[in-house]
Amino acid sequence: MRVIFAGTPAVAIPALAAVADSRHELLAVVTRPDAPAGRGRGLSRSPVAAWADEQGVEVLTPARPREPEFLDRLRALAPDCVPVVAYGALVPPVALEIPQHGWVNLHFSLLPAWRGAAPVQHAVLHGDELTGASVFQLEQGLDTGPVYGTLTDEVGPADTSGDLLERLAHSGAGLLTAVLDAIEDGTARAEPQPVDGVSLAPKLTVADARVRWGDPAFAVDRRVRACTPAPGPWTTFRDERVKLGPVTPVADGPELKPGELLVERSRVLAGTATTPVRLGEVRAAGKRAMPASDWARGVRVTVGEVLA
């Protein structure tokens, strides 16, 4: 088939590369426009656009995919299908209807669970033991279209969202190309999503990433892993924001108040609503990340001080 790939962040690259290496003809990519990035806030190409530039593939960057110029170019290219991974914009019906086989989306959850922008983060945050990826027909609803195929992946006890997303990006690439092959062969079958089991996964905010020391230790651990690497778990110490690396629940730890710090010879503990957690890395504003023990010595944590 003749295809145009729609996607924006780095997580879309494995699928884009797989499509480019498949039996299908990659005509162009559709991605979000250049956006400010870095401390200098200069305009930066999306990872998908940068990949396409290196490969000599045409790049389409409509501010909105309903723009007449974009729709005209889409019609002129005449794709049979548009595979999508994390494009980042709502696609209007007029664009969805242009390819013969529509737009086919790779989503990183087992639909209908975790529809929305942050399915992997919510799977980790809510303690799911099993997640996966789904390829479905894009329609106007939020991730509501019929599903062509799925794959599963176990969520490990130490998995961060970044770990899980990287695995799903690569395994999902194979699922997406297999669905494209089946569509071309006429063997693809899309099944409606179940009515039961629907959950939503809105984007996690910086406020969501603030550690809640009044939660049980297992929930603190989940929040830290869910928000790693983005938006980045954080807390405050002496009214200054600090970022946190991994934490480990300590089942036999001493009794501490929520957020209360205890500095021992080889570890730093912080209290929760249940048992404490061991801090991994800490990064103060303007500083590099360092082991929690080094941080505690540097700031001279005193008895009774807390993270908040």
Curated annotation (Swiss-Prot):
One term of GO molecular function: methionyl-tRNA formyltransferase activity
SUPFAM superfamilies in the record: FMT C-terminal domain-like (SSF50486), Formyltransferase (SSF53328)
Keyword Protein biosynthesis: yes
A Gene Ontology cellular-component term: cytosol
Reaction(s) catalysed by this chain's protein: L-methionyl-tRNA(fMet) + (6R)-10-formyltetrahydrofolate = N-formyl-L-methionyl-tRNA(fMet) + (6S)-5,6,7,8-tetrahydrofolate + H(+)
EC id: 2.1.2.9
InterPro entries linked to this entry: Fmt (IPR005794), Formyl_trans_C (IPR005793), Formyl_transf_N (IPR002376), Formyl_transf_N_sf (IPR036477), Formyl_transferase-like_C_sf (IPR011034), Met-tRNA-FMT_C (IPR044135), Met-tRNA-FMT_N (IPR041711)
Amino acids binding (6S)-5,6,7,8-tetrahydrofolate: 109-112
Similarity-based family: Belongs to the Fmt family.
Protein name (Swiss-Prot/TrEMBL): Methionyl-tRNA formyltransferase
Species annotation: Salinispora arenicola (strain CNS-205)
